[in-house]
Amino acid sequence: MRQTTIVKHKEVNKKWFLIDADGVVLGKLATLTASILRGKNKPDFTPNVDMGDNIVIINAEKVVLTANKEEDKKYYSHSGYPGGLKVINAAKLRAKKPIAIVEKAVKGMLPHTKLGRQQFRNLYVYAGSVHKQEAQQPVRIEVK
């Protein structure tokens, strides 16, 4: 009879992946990224261990929002004071901070716990095609 294997944090081998977001739908990009960050693509997935890989996303400013989401999708933040609700749509957020749309989509798909925050730190998003992780030699992944 086989025993259940439990992976320890020290036993995890993290790889580096590169995803080009040029012309890719935001939802497909975010689901693939969140799955890899959690490590769900590995056969020995353990939900309580950070066993996900590192991901570099380039050309985040060229990600595609379907339908009329560019104007209709709203991002909310609150200052904590009465009347402190701030609302910005996707078009203005893209003009102000292009990487924020991708980061918010991926962060919303990760667990809202300490482990989820730790896994989110393995994501590197760049607006253009130049990135600082050349030395890690990331493997390119195509989003379908």
Curated annotation (Swiss-Prot):
Entry annotated with the keyword Iron: no
Single GO biological process annotation from the record: translation
UniProtKB keywords: Ribonucleoprotein, Ribosomal protein
InterPro entries recorded: Ribosomal_uL13, Ribosomal_uL13_bac-type, Ribosomal_uL13_CS, Ribosomal_uL13_sf
Any GO MF annotation of the entry: structural constituent of ribosome
Any single Pfam family the record assigns to this protein: Ribosomal_L13
GO cellular component, one term: cytosolic large ribosomal subunit
Family affiliation: Belongs to the universal ribosomal protein uL13 family.
HAMAP family in alphabetical order: Ribosomal_uL13
Role summary: This protein is one of the early assembly proteins of the 50S ribosomal subunit, although it is not seen to bind rRNA by itself. It is important during the early stages of 50S assembly.
Complex and partners: Part of the 50S ribosomal subunit.
Entry protein name: Large ribosomal subunit protein uL13
Source organism per UniProt: Mycoplasmopsis pulmonis (strain UAB CTIP)
